[in-house]
Regions:
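C-terminal alpha-helical "lid/dimerization" subdomain adjacent to the S-adenosyl-L-methionine
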Residues: 8, 15, 32-34, 150-208
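Class I SAM-dependent methyltransferase Rossmann-like catalytic core
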Residues: 22-33
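Conserved alpha-helix/loop element of class I SAM-dependent methyltransferases that forms part
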Residues: 34-52
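A short acidic, Gly/Pro-enriched loop at the edge of an enzyme's catalytic core
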Residues: 108-120
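Class I SAM-dependent methyltransferase SAM/SAH-binding core
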Residues: 55, 59-109
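N-terminal, positively charged/glycine-rich alpha-helical extensions of SAM-dependent methyltransferases
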Residues: 1-24
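A short SAM/SAH-binding and catalytic strip from SAM-dependent methyltransferases
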Residues: 119-131
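A short glycine-rich, Lys/Arg-flanked "PGG" loop and its adjoining helix->strand segment in the class I
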Residues: 133-145
Length: 219
């Protein structure tokens, strides 16, 4: 498939994602977990200014769980059972009583009622799912009216060496387990979500935080 930037991308499916994260699970915390740590920390700091129920989609090994304030009720989901095993170990070892469930679940088919969470956050998720549009609609559906949907993610660029590398990596997305070429317009699809903040994050601005507010009424 050709992307809007002219790179040839491959379609990923659930098996590709599970296979990739089965390989990553044993070393995730010490590799990508470190690279993405600053963005994850910043997102949780923002969420900690809110209250109520939080759904973390793509909770992984639970790296963010100890950083949420104790008054928030946290629910996490992930497609990888290996990642979730590590997250559950973390919850038990650190006594995180505000974590109220970690579930193996497909982000494109969330098993929660509509309007269930005050905040829905997906960190480093949108480039690893086979159908980002479907996932985005599920994030919006499960968020309460007036609540917030937050993304932290890599979004591609046309510029310089980084853009050149992303385009060269695009055909290998199924093996990498993520889409190197991924535009912001792929998540700007839900009319009920208003973008309230977009910010490049440290280090180096590779990752971006996007915050959306869900409309109080449909339409």
């Amino acid at each position: 498939m050709k992307t809007s930037r002219g790179a040839t991308a491959v379609q990923m499916d659930e098996a590709d994602v599970k296979s990739a994260y089965r390989r990553w699970a044993p070393v995730y915390d010490h590799t990508f977990g470190r690279v993405a740590g600053e963005g994850r920390k910043h997102a949780v700091e923002v969420i900690n200014q809110s209250s109520g129920r939080v759904l973390e989609v793509g909770v992984g090994t639970g790296l963010s769980l100890p950083d949420y304030k104790s008054s928030l009720e946290i629910v996490g989901i992930d497609l990888s059972p290996e990642m979730l095993d590590k997250a559950r170990e973390r919850v038990a070892e650190e006594g995180l009583e505000n974590v109220n469930g970690l579930y193996e679940m497909d982000a494109s088919e969330l098993k929660f009622n509509s309007n269930s969470f005050d905040t829905v956050v997906a960190m480093y998720v949108m480039t690893v799912v086979p159908d980002p549009a479907k996932v985005m609609r599920e994030l919006a559906r499960t968020c309460k009216p007036g609540g917030e949907v937050m993304l932290v993610n890599h979004f591609s660029t046309d510029d310089g060496v980084r853009g050149w590398v992303e385009r060269r990596m695009a055909p290998f997305g199924d093996k990498l387990g993520w889409h190197p070429v991924f535009d912001t317009d792929r998540v700007m699809i839900c009319p009920e979500l208003q973008l309230i903040e977009k910010r490049a994050l440290r280090p180096w601005g590779i990752f971006t935080m996007m915050r959306f507010r869900k409309a109080l009424t449909a339409g």
